[in-house]
């Protein structure tokens, strides 16, 4: 298997989903703007999304995938199928309980996650109603992520990468055609979440059947391997929860700021999700099962080499994305979101949040490379300790930044916290000899810095001298102008890299 090809496949399919995600957010911004309705929906949608990351894509995947890789390497296919059935039964059992509790406790959940909403009765009640419709998404998407973890472990990377597209399609269809049929109209978005979750799960089932894993889940408390997964999940849940708790605390802080602050941070975060989703998710998707295989076979040289490959690709592609997001922040926000109810003031506030977020992009994506280095070795406690320390530091930064910088300070704290997290993980991997840097890092970094300066300077000069207008022009013209700038930035960066000796085959890596 060519890992670079697999990364390109996962990244391109994820890109399709992210582009549709921007289309969806543009449509939502045009229909609802940034105000009470969107604030309540984003809070209600954030909570099941948070639990999804904790139970499925976060803690569960960290605990499940390495043990599944161990079964693949050391056990028979029949034993692996039994293991998967038992894990599916346990996961379904937990998810039913969590979903039921979430629906019943919706008022308390909203009060804890956005206490500022309690001052406005209508806003508070609407948040509760939206949460009760969106909460079953946790059950659907967690099972979908479970299926995706199995497919990824068998190198069927494309199917799970394409699956999120269905949620965006559901959002787009409901926003365009069903809003008039709901009262209040924002309830259409909540039902779009539910339908999208159903579609994501159902789409993957035929491929699961081809692998022989589409069996009725079976609840077993006596399976030793399932108990190992549960034991690994305990610290993993704590670790993933720490990151999500940080986001919830930021929402709590933002709920006390002026109306629209939650939405400004949300839209800026959506722009950040393009590189984190395309590159970060793609790297994490490929690295965890592959590293787990090397850990199971105790091949330390291949393990370290794979981490080195991931870090180089991470820096090569993430740093220009961060520079681009910062330098092109205003063109990006106005082109994608500034229509109808989304005002120039909303665009400027979102721009400032995006610039602050961009400082942490390299940290966010490096975590996706470094953390699997621990998870694959079934060491979850170390990243948890790092995450807890980072949470404390992030909240101290929130307290320091919120008064002078408002919502921008909250965004900056998240970014700097991510960089701190990544730096500590890197230090610990080096300290324990798990990762040994390959040759040529100094020259690699110098060439990258030169290329980034050329790219950033070129984009800044282009915006200064080219007669581009971003406020009083139509969406198609803005999109055309933005494409010109993106093409210019990408061209400057990759031509500079080529001139300095970089070639695609330098990053090719083949795994069995």
Model regions and ranges:
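Membrane-embedded alpha-helical bundles of multi-pass transporters/translocases
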Residues: 1-512
């Amino acid at each position: 298997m060519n890992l670079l090809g697999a990364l390109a496949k996962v990244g391109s399919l994820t890109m399709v989903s992210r582009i549709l995600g921007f289309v969806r957010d543009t449509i939502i911004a045009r229909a609802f703007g940034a105000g009470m309705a969107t604030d309540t929906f984003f809070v209600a949608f954030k909570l099941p999304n948070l639990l999804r990351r904790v139970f499925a894509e976060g803690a569960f995947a960290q605990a499940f995938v390495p043990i599944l890789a161990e079964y693949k390497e050391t056990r028979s296919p029949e034993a692996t199928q039994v293991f998967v059935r038992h894990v599916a039964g346990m996961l379904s059992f937990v998810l039913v309980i969590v979903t039921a509790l979430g629906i019943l406790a919706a008022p308390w959940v909203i009060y804890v996650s956005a206490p500022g909403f309690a001052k406005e009765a209508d806003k508070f009640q609407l948040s509760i109603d939206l949460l009760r419709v969106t909460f079953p998404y946790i059950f659907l998407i967690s099972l979908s992520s479970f299926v995706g973890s199995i497919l990824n472990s068998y190198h069927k990377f494309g199917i799970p990468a394409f699956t999120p597209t269905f949620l965006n399609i559901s959002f787009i269809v409901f926003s365009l055609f069903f809003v008039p049929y709901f009262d209040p109209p924002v309830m259409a978005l909540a039902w779009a979440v539910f339908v999208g979750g159903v579609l994501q799960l159902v789409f993957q089932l035929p491929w699961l059947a081809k692998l022989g894993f589409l069996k009725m889940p079976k609840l077993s408390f006596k399976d030793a391997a399932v108990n190992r997964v549960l034991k690994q999940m305990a610290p993993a849940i704590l670790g993933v929860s720490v990151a999500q708790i940080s986001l919830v605390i930021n929402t709590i802080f933002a709920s006390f700021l002026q109306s629209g602050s939650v939405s400004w941070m949300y839209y800026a975060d959506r722009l950040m999700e393009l590189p984190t989703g395309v590159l970060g998710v793609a790297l994490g998707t490929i690295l965890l099962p592959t590293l787990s295989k090397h850990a199971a076979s105790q091949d330390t040289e291949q393990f370290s080499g794979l981490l080195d490959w991931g870090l180089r690709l991470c820096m090569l592609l993430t740093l220009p994305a961060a520079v681009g997001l910062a330098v092109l922040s205003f063109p990006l926000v106005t082109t994608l979101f500034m229509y109808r109810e989304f005002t120039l003031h909303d665009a400027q506030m979102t721009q400032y949040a995006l610039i602050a977020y961009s400082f942490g992009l390299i940290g966010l994506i490096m975590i996706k490379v470094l953390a699997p280095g621990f998870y694959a070795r079934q060491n979850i406690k170390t990243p948890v300790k790092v995450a807890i320390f980072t949470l404390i530091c992030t909240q101290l930064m929130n307290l320091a930044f919120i008064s002078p910088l408002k919502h921008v300070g909250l965004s900056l704290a998240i970014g700097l916290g991510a960089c701190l997290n990544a730096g500590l993980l890197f230090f610990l991997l080096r300290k324990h000899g798990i990762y040994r840097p390959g040759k040529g890092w100094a020259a690699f970094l110098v060439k990258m810095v030169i290329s980034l300066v050329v790219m950033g300077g070129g984009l800044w000069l282009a915006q200064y001298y080219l007669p581009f207008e971003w406020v009083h022009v139509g969406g198609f013209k803005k999109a055309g102008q933005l494409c010109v700038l993106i093409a210019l930035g990408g061209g400057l960066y990759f031509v500079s890299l080529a001139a300095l000796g970089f070639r695609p085959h330098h990053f090719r890596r083949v795994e069995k």
